[in-house]
């Protein structure tokens, strides 16, 4: 996937992804309208130690993030935007365990619209696929882990996973690529409280206003650019409650 195509894919799926993520929000208490220093948002995901990935896995996922969401002069890439942090926290939680979904046999291959038909959880898929991808990269003439390969070589591997021409041991490379692309998109466009979309960079890129609760002053103002910065579940810097 070229940088231009990747950006087009991200923008084209943005509106659906900003409202449907794998994460489940905590309860947000308080009354509307919100006032500065009066909110009570759920706890934010903070970057730091990894909850699911090993350090080697995290380095690989961050490298993958910067190839799927490459940085440019306007917007940070997937690594800086926190996509790997988002995926890490998701895999460590209910999403990683497929919690709440029916995952009992028999497993019959269905249509793409029916979703995964397997007992393999997202956490298992990532753990096994990342290990297989590492073996594939180290066994190639380069002999290096994915994170240390040149960007051109990284793109070749991703293109091979997408097309099915790169085969990973014991896992379906195409299935992993589809899951990775979906999760990267969600991490890039989800509310920053879940670890990705750091500083609301993706929302600013597409002009998405976020979780503002009142647009009454703008309902009748057609073809005007909305001038206010986006707002997340936790508010924005000047809305953040002061710590006593």
Indicate residue ranges for each PLM-predicted region.
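Mature-region segments of soluble proteins
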Residues: 2, 45-46, 56-63, 74-244
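C-terminal segment of N-terminal export signals and the immediately downstream linker at the start
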Residues: 3-8, 20-63
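Basic side chains
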Residues: 6-7, 11, 154
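Sec-dependent signal peptide hydrophobic core
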Residues: 13-17
């Amino acid at each position: 996937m070229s940088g231009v195509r990747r950006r087009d894919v991200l923008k084209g799926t943005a509106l659906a992804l900003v409202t449907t993520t794998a994460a489940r929000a905590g309860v947000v208490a308080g009354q509307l309208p919100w006032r500065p220093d009066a909110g009570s948002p759920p706890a934010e995901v903070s970057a730091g130690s990894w909850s699911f990935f090993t350090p080697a896995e995290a380095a690989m996922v961050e490298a993958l993030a910067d190839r799927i969401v490459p940085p440019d002069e306007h917007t940070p890439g997937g690594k800086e935007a926190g996509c790997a942090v988002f995926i890490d926290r998701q895999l460590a939680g209910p999403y990683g365990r497929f919690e709440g979904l029916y995952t009992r046999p028999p497993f019959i291959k269905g249509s793409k619209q029916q979703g995964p038909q397997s007992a393999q959880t997202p956490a298992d898929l990532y753990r096994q696929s990342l290990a297989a991808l590492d073996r594939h990269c180290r066994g190639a003439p380069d002999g290096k882990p994915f994170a240390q390969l040149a960007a051109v070589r990284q793109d070749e591997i991703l293109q091979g996973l997408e097309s099915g021409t790169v085969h990973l041991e014991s896992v379906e490379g195409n299935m992993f690529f589809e899951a990775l692309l979906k999760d990267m998109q969600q991490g890039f466009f989800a509310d920053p409280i879940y670890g990705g979309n750091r500083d609301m960079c993706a929302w600013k890129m597409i002009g998405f206003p976020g979780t503002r609760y009142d647009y009454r002053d703008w309902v009748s103002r057609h073809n005007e650019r909305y001038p206010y910065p986006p707002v997340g579940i936790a508010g924005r810097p000047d809305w953040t409650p002061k710590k006593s």
